[in-house]
């Protein structure tokens, strides 16, 4: 793709992300994406062969941003496993306090595509969640947690549950409750 086409491609990806996030993948048309980026539909299809391919590229871009943010978060955490857990759930509560917060876009997308198990976007979402969980395992291992992969899976399960319940109930206290449960889990694993 020509170098001058990159800004157009980035604009398309940014607009598609916003529209998919606000309204859901199935409720957004390629016409709307073209209109939002002020390009013709032909230009849109020159960059992305299909809406499915566009979604895959949007998710890849969001995956990279989210992983970078999570790594930055992890780099700021030092000390005890409890500090890691408390930081994770504190940041989840802060994230959930954003205006018009709607939970994890990756999770919402998988729910939207539940009847399409082979859809490429689902594979990207699976990989995204697995990479975040693996990074948490690395943080826990560096903090001296035994069986860090297993503990990370359990804590990740609590974080996903907290995200879902904060979205359903609009109550950020679920993050603190999940942090308490995760810390109990870590303490009990030391006995």
Give the label of every model feature segment.
Residues 118-127, 141-185, 189:
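Hydrophobic/aromatic-rich alpha-helical bundle segments in the mid-to-C-terminal region
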Residues 1-23, 27-39, 52-56:
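Basic, helix-initiating cap at the start of DNA-binding domains
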Residues 96-119:
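Amphipathic alpha-helical segments used for helix-helix packing
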Residues 38-48:
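Short hydrophobic/aromatic patch on the recognition helix
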Residues 55-62, 69:
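Alpha-helical DNA-contacting segments of helix-turn-helix folds
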Residues 12-20, 92, 136, 159:
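Short hydrophobic clusters on alpha-helical segments that form packing/core surfaces
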Residues 5, 13, 59, 63, ...:
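Amphipathic, non-transmembrane alpha-helical scaffold segments
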